[in-house]
């Protein structure tokens, strides 16, 4: 028989830097889950990822106090800002441009995000990422 699910916890945790302090500790503690077990498992799985890059994670809590977690890809906005070399998007995205991205940079971001996107093919994924970049005030070339 399958285990009974008590809830889902969605967090964004910096890669390789999970520790029992907030927001992780209180979120897992409320459900009675082993905080250190999650931190060790998460840090082990994110060893190959750039340290500090926020990784969205969905933790499934079960009635027997056990858990499983699924890691998603980093948010597109963070990958876009990193590729464009900017700290933050433009406060007036359609008038003030803060950076530039070309097609190859967009394709690289789309390849990273592909598992989490609903796009049918790579071209659709690139257009999705290009739209996100435009809404941040970053100029897009070649799309």
Curated annotation (Swiss-Prot):
It holds the Pfam family Ribosomal_L11_N. One or more lysine residues are methylated. CDD domains: Ribosomal_L11. The keyword Acyltransferase does not apply. Disulfide bonds: none annotated. GO terms for cellular component: cytosolic large ribosomal subunit. Keywords: Methylation, Ribonucleoprotein, Ribosomal protein, RNA-binding, rRNA-binding. GO terms for biological process: translation. GO terms for molecular function: large ribosomal subunit rRNA binding; structural constituent of ribosome. Belongs to the universal ribosomal protein uL11 family. Part of the ribosomal stalk of the 50S ribosomal subunit. Interacts with L10 and the large rRNA to form the base of the stalk. L10 forms an elongated spine to which L12 dimers bind in a sequential fashion forming a multimeric L10(L12)X complex. NCBIfam families: L11_bact. Forms part of the ribosomal stalk which helps the ribosome interact with GTP-bound translation factors. PANTHER family: 60S RIBOSOMAL PROTEIN L12, LARGE RIBOSOMAL SUBUNIT PROTEIN UL11M. This is Large ribosomal subunit protein uL11. The gene is rplK.
């Amino acid at each position: 028989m399958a285990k009974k699910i008590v809830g889902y916890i969605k967090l964004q945790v910096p890669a390789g830097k999970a520790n029992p302090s907030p927001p992780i500790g209180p979120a897992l503690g409320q459900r009675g889950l082993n905080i250190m077990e999650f931190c060790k498992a998460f840090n082990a799985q994110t060893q190959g990822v750039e340290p500090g890059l926020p990784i969205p994670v969905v933790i499934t809590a079960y009635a027997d106090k056990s858990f499983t977690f699924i890691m998603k890809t980093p948010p597109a906005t963070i990958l876009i800002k990193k590729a464009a070399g900017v700290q933050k998007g433009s406060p007036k995205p359609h008038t003030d441009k803060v950076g530039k991205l070309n097609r190859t940079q967009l394709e690289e971001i789309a390849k990273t995000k592909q598992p989490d996107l609903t796009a049918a093919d790579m071209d659709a994924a690139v257009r999705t990422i290009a739209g996100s970049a435009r809404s941040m005030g970053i100029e897009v070339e070649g799309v």
